[in-house]
Amino acid sequence: IYFTAGGSESDNWAIKAVAESYKEKGKHIITTKIEHHAVLHTCEYLERQGYEVTYVGVDEYGVVKLDEIEKAIRPDTILISVMAANNEIGTIQPLKEIGELAHKHGVIFHTDAVQAYGHIPLNVDELGIDLLSASGHKFHAPKGIGFLYIRKNIRIGSFIHGGAQERARRAGTLNTPGIVGIGAAAECAKLNMEKNIEAQTSLRDYLIKRVLEEIPYSRLNGHPTKRLPGNANFCFRFIEGESMLILLDQQGICASSGSACTSGSLDPSHVLLAIGLPHEIAHGSLRLTLSEDNTKEEIDFTVEALKKIIVRLREMSPLYEDFLKQNENV
């Protein structure tokens, strides 16, 4: 375990260091179209340095296509990087099968587990993971601390040069309070994981059921069951996601229309486009993330507020008005 400033640094270190250390074997990397930008932008950087990257597709639920991964593997493939669970739609990936594919062909397997670590079981030996990125703030540790797990037989060099901290692999004064915090948070997450999964899954399923049954022209994004226990992501037709967020915020409800890292962007989510949604529907997305501390009463409050907000926004939508007129004539 090597401590970092967070998930983005861990992803950058894992991918760039493998690229540098194994370039004699090859310069080909495989990842997916729905990765976090910490992975996608790192791969784009490496492409500018002469590396080749294959971006494999996903199905309608956001599950990576294993056959595409296997077809993409070449003699010069050095790394497969697939996230453990998607940060926007919550879909959990078949890591064990991907790990088996990678090792069958002698390829290193990295997973960005930032969204999953502390929320679902992740055993690096059982899943065949060689490199794993995590970030503390995703499981109640302080912000600004994360880690990169590196399997002992993986030879990668330093990402930050200078002193001999972290066994000479990451220079710089260690963030001791952050390290203590992430250690305590990891311990708590492991101790309470089974109970938290049960509580979050129950609330999540209740939220999804109410939204889909009570709000017309809504859809759930991501896998219906193989998803993070605290994730619910919806699309509502004829509505802009940003408008929903503003009105929810006025009710004291925190939500997002994509990933937190792209909340300032007006472009539709690359994840929703990758699962096949058209631009106009992807623009009406809403992500609600639950914790073990949420209550059924808070879910009820949120759903009631959301129903009123959607009615209000659709009344102002020319697209919805046109849709109703067209259906009147059918």
Task: Describe the residue ranges of each PLM region.
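Pyridoxal 5′-phosphate
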Residues: I1-V330
